[in-house]
Structure formats: C-alpha cells, structure tokens
Amino acid sequence: MLSRIEQELAQLGITNVKEIVHNPSYEQLFEEEMKPGLDGFEKGVLTNSGAVAVDTGIFTGRSPKDKYIVYDETTKDNVWWTSEAVKNDNKPMSQSTWENLKDVVTHQLSNKRLFVIDAFCGASKTHRLAVRIITEVAWQAHFVKNMFIRPTADELKVFEPNFVVMNGSKVTNPNWQAQGLNSENFVAFNLTERIQLIGGTWYGGEMKKGMFSMMNYLLPLKNVASMHCSANVGKEGDVAVFFGLSGTGKTTLSTDPKRKLIGDDEHGWDEHGVFNYEGGCYAKTINLSEENEPDIYRAIRRDALLENVVVAEDGSIDFADKSKTENTRVSYPIYHIDNIVEPVSKAGHAQKVIFLTADAFGVLPPVAKLTPEQTKYYFLSGFTAKLAGTERGITEPTPTFSACFGAAFLSLHPTKYAEVLVQRMEAAGSQAYLVNTGWNGTGKRISIKDTRGIIDAILDGSIEKATTHALPVFDLRVPDALPGVDTAILDPRDTYAEAAEWHAKAEDLAARFVKNFEKYTTNEEGKALVAAGPQLSK
C-alpha cells in the first residue's frame, strides 16, 4: 500500500521511489550534505563559520535563455510574451514539448531516493502559494527550506500543494534541437498544471526566482502589487520599500539597525499592507566583510548555505575570491538576522517607496522626490548602470533598463505592475523617491555614509522640509540641503569642474532613456508619461 506522499508523487508520474525524505530537519539535511559517499556537485563542504558550502557547477547564475512558459488557454492572453520588437525571457512552449520534458524529469526522479520539501511562498494566507519541491539533491532541499516560508507542524499536517517544483538538475533534454529550444537545459512553467520543471542546471536561484515569476503572474491579476524590492518598518509602524536591480543596495540599505526587516527581495502589497514572499535571504557575498555588512556576515553560520565560494583547507572562506564567479551567494533563514518582523514577515502599507539606481554615467542626483507621473516613468524604465572595463582599461558605463526593476521576473506586461503599484501608493498616500547610489563627477561612488544619510532623511521625513530646485534635462526636484549629507554632492553639476561636462553627459543619458521608453508608447497611457521623463534639447 502506497503512503499518501507516494500516491501524490505517482500522480505526477514519479514512481517506485526508493525512499522519500519528507520535510527533513536542518540537522538531517546537514548529515545528508556531509555524507562521505557524495561526489560532484552533491557534496557539501563544512566551513569554519559552521555553514555548509556547495558548488552549483557551470551554472553560477540563472539561465534566462532557457526559460519557457507553456502557451495555452490560461496564458495566451495574459503573459507578456517575447517578441521580435521587445525581447524578454517569456518564451512560449507547446503542450507536446512540455509533456516530453515532464517525462524526462519524472523518469529521472523515479526509482530514486528523493527529498520533498513543503513550504509557502507568501506571508499572506490569502495570497500565498503552497509549494512542494521535489529533488534528488540534499543541498537543494536545504536551499528551499532556507528560502521559502517554513510551515508550522500543524500546517504541515494539512498541507496541500497548489504548485509543484520538480528539480531534475541531473538530467538534460536530448530533443532540444528538434523542439526548437535554446539548449539541452530548461526551466519551464505550466500555469494550468501549476508545475515548474528544471533540467540541466543546479543553480538554486532557479527555484526561488521561478516561484517569484509565478507570484508575478498570479497576484497583479488580483490587484495585488508584486514587487522586486526589499522592505522594512520603523518603530512607529512606518513601512518603506526599496526597489532596485542587483548591486544597487537593496539588501544593504534595508538592513538598518533602527528598523525591522520585512524581507530583502520579493514582496506583495495587498489591501492589508506589504508582505514578504520568502522565509529567508539570498545575499551576495563577494567582498563581504564584517565591518561593512555585519548582519549578513553574522548570518553565515550553521544552517546557512554558501554557493560557489572558495574554501581553504582549514575551512576558512576568502570572500574576495571570484575565481568561480562574481555571483557568490549565501542563503539563510530570515531569523539569522536579529532585527526582523516576527512571527510573520508582513507589515502595513508603505509610506515611502524608494527606487535605487547606481548611475555610472555620473548624471543623476543622489536623491530626487518624484511626482506621480515620474514615479510611473522611472518604475517602467528601471534604470541602473555598471562600469565595465574595456580592452584599453577605460571604464565605460553600461546602461541597464529593466522594467519595474525586475524585467527578468515579470510574467505580465510591465504597465500592469506600474498600474497596481500606483493604485496601492495612491490609496496609502505614499511618496516615491529616486536614490542614486552610483558615481558622480568626482569619479568616485557616492559614499555609503551619504546614502544612508539620504535614506534617513526620507524615512524620518526631514527631506519634506528641505527646499528644492529643479535639475535641468531630467526636471527632477533636488533638495538644497539635508542633515548629515555632504551638501556639495546633492546637485550632481557641482561635482564637475565644469557644469557643461555634466550637461553633455545628461543629454547622452537622457537620449538613452527616451529610446528605451519608446516601447511603452504604443498606448495612450504610455504616451502620456513621456512628458514625465527627460527632455532632449531640440
């Protein structure tokens, strides 16, 4: 007689399972990761921090070119599909290819010893997904136990999954060429069956961001904002959300000793307020130091899981070593951070909405207060820029425009996210600010001390008392002075020897904004927002 869990796996096509390790404890997972017989990417290494380190193989980041969504009655009119005109990661997949991939993965997972983790995605009981993750690999089970919300013992007794992730990282798709796919690896979603299939990639982030993409599909259709942001709350219950692409400071700036962390990456905003999707944090560890990021540094202990870091024979970690990848990471349960919202990662409505950008062009001001129209414009633009070395050693800025500060994870059209966010902001009387954590005319990055001073001024309301003036080209309102912030940096023109040099760079960046925004001007709402963006001199 099959047990209930065996029957449920058999319904998915996974049969003759040797053993099911169902919802193991951290202690059990540690023992599994340390088993002497493990080899390859299954092997865990104990570091002197107490945390286990693993390697994810050739995939040290997500594989967006291998992401597909089944094109069917459920999705055909809702998904923001890729097109020749505007490319994105939502590539359509036929039902027959899906069936084939499902056979490939279920065949791989059958006749094996499996780990099954049941967890929630979403701290709101109304809007959460009950996710079941099935994998052969102990550390992948550990990763999702860290990253998703861990149900209580009572919740586990009655747990009924409404989304299933089948991780077949050890198997690839032999028919990919005939099926017209990008490669033998795949990350595929079926919204009718509510299943995610993974093949060929061991990277843990595919499971985390996969469920984020699904929340990004399901929630805005129910008028719940779905956001790639961090969030925290002050002593008075005042909530702030921080949007921003990778490397702009979301995790660093929302981890604030004066405020409690709601979450560091993915949130929803419904009629009750802001809630975290996750039960853990997935922090970058490149160049991590206790001095600069004490909370993250101290979170790396037993039960944390390090990815692709270089571990010496004595178990010490060299966080500066990027020989495997720059995208070294650690996942840990959120309670490894002291100052968090407990027991449930949620709070009220956000009063302050902060768009973080790291402008390597040296044009944008360290802070500007946005009008409602500018809020939509800069949200849809999702701008940041990095400095990339060219062959002569000159560092050229490379711009990135990523809709809603998270285009890779958007399943619906970007304007839907902007519309729902602004509705929530208007209902709560929220104010948006653009905060640039990047470079200025001195050639140096704006100091973390000044950026923290700016964030403090936004959060304590002192920015509202500041007099402002308009920055030309972008027509952004810039404060004349803020407490605890170097006044000389507030207007970026003052950081150049010649204001004309700033102006030339501003025209260049403005032209890039204008060109990027053209894709949103196919409807009236988009056309109406053009005036809120930078204006080129005729």
UniProtKB/Swiss-Prot annotation:
The protein's Enzyme Commission number: 4.1.1.49
Binding site for Mn(2+): K209, H228, D265
Binding of substrate, residues: R62, Y203, K209, R329
GO biological process, one term: gluconeogenesis
Gene3D superfamilies: 3.90.228.20, Phosphoenolpyruvate Carboxykinase, domain 1 (3.40.449.10), Phosphoenolpyruvate Carboxykinase, domain 2 (2.170.8.10)
Keyword tRNA processing part of the UniProt annotation: no
Free-text comment on the cofactor: Binds 1 Mn(2+) ion per subunit.
Superkingdom: Bacteria
Location of this chain's protein in the cell: Cytoplasm
Signal peptide residues on this chain, from the entry's feature table: none
One Pfam family from the record: PEPCK_ATP
A GO molecular-function annotation: phosphoenolpyruvate carboxykinase (ATP) activity
Cofactors, names only: Mn(2+)
Catalytic reaction(s) noted: oxaloacetate + ATP = phosphoenolpyruvate + ADP + CO2
GO CC annotation: cytosol
Ligand binding (ATP): 209, 228, 244-252, 293, 329, 445-446, 451
Pathway: Carbohydrate biosynthesis; gluconeogenesis
Keyword list, A-Z: ATP-binding, Cytoplasm, Decarboxylase, Gluconeogenesis, Lyase, Manganese, Metal-binding, Nucleotide-binding
Alphabetized CDD domains for the sequence: PEPCK_ATP
Assembly behavior: Monomer.
Family named by the database record: Belongs to the phosphoenolpyruvate carboxykinase (ATP) family.
Function description: Involved in the gluconeogenesis. Catalyzes the conversion of oxaloacetate (OAA) to phosphoenolpyruvate (PEP) through direct phosphoryl transfer between the nucleoside triphosphate and OAA.
Protein's name in the database: Phosphoenolpyruvate carboxykinase (ATP)
Species this chain originates from: Haemophilus ducreyi (strain 35000HP / ATCC 700724)
